[in-house]
Regions:
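Bacterial N-terminal signal peptides
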Residues: 20-33
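N-terminal secretory signal peptides that target proteins for export/translocation
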Residues: 1-16
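Intrinsic structural disorder/low-complexity segments
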Residues: 7-10, 23, 158-160
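Intrinsic disorder/low-structure terminal segments
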Residues: 13-15, 23, 38
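HIT superfamily nucleotide-processing domains
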Residues: 38-271
Length: 271
């Protein structure tokens, strides 16, 4: 009941933020596009995973309609991989425990699994849909802020990276250090903070905790969007660029880091 009440409270706050942003934009003669926060069923992902994928996996070792279900540590530590209905190559990692999204304090709990390495490993499903191997820096992971999502179950988007985003990060890879620094350029029309993680760092340093401890003073991640993109650093070192951006609805920015991903996977056709 407490979790449901918290979700309802956040939905009310989201609507209020968006209403205020829209009023300011109208007063300024601007036009902004708000996310669809009135999605028909905001529990659709949770229902699919909890009521279908997990029972099928437990009873028949068949994760359908999900692509995969991992329950080695039990449902509180498990996750499912589901092909998203949008896009040719997009998949989602969805925890099998109830976690609403970026506003959940569970994200910082010491017993929460680090879902990001498993999401990265799921790039093989993206490659299968693309019908080719994809370079390390062609893949990205994203979680949208509480203001930009349509579902009230945490999910990590897994897909190809937008070609211009890949090119920009490659051109500035030497400027991205191991602490949070604001990028001096925009990605898809918005500014991000970035930091360098080595290949093992994604498992050793949970991005949720990295953002909460080093970037968000209050530890409140609700309006943050997080993106992880594969990167090639100096001397061929593989790693990741961790990106974080705070939603600012009064400026028409709802924290939709998923914009950095390309659900048509144009990179697969380019190389």
């Amino acid at each position: 009941m407490r979790e449901q009440g918290a979700q309802a409270d956040w939905r009310s706050r989201c609507r209020l933020w968006i209403m205020r942003a829209t009023m300011v934009a109208i007063a300024a003669g601007l036009s902004i596009a708000a996310p669809n926060i009135a999605f028909a069923d905001r529990n659709a992902l949770w229902t699919i995973v909890h009521d279908q994928c997990v029972p099928e996996q437990e009873s028949h070792q068949d994760p359908a309609p999900c692509t995969a279900v991992a329950l080695d540590g039990g449902q509180p530590r498990g996750y499912a991989i589901l092909k998203d209905r949008n896009g040719a190559t997009q998949f989602l990692l969805i925890p099998t425990r109830r976690i609403a999204g970026m506003e959940s304090p569970d994200l910082l709990a010491p017993d929460l699994p680090n879902y990001w390495p498993a999401a990265w490993d799921a790039k093989r499903f993206v490659e299968a849909r693309a019908k080719r191997a994809l370079a390390w820096d062609m893949i990205g992971l994203a979680i949208n802020s509480v203001l930009a999502r349509s579902q009230d179950q945490l999910h990590i988007h897994i897909d190809c990276v937008q070609p211009d985003v890949r090119a920009a990060l490659a051109a500035h890879s030497g400027d991205i250090g191991r602490t949070w620094t604001e990028l001096p350029f925009d990605l898809r029309g918005r500014r991000y903070f970035a930091m360098h993680l080595d290949a093992a760092g994604l498992a050793a340093q949970d991005p949720f905790k990295r953002a909460a401890s080093g970037l968000v003073a209050s530890g409140d991640l609700a309006r943050e969007t997080l993106v992880v993109i594969g990167a090639n650093f100096a001397e061929g070192e593989k790693g990741f660029v961790l990106l974080a951006g705070k939603a600012d609805p009064l400026k028409g920015d709802f924290g939709h880091g998923e914009d950095l991903l390309d659900h048509a996977c144009g990179l697969a056709a380019q190389e």
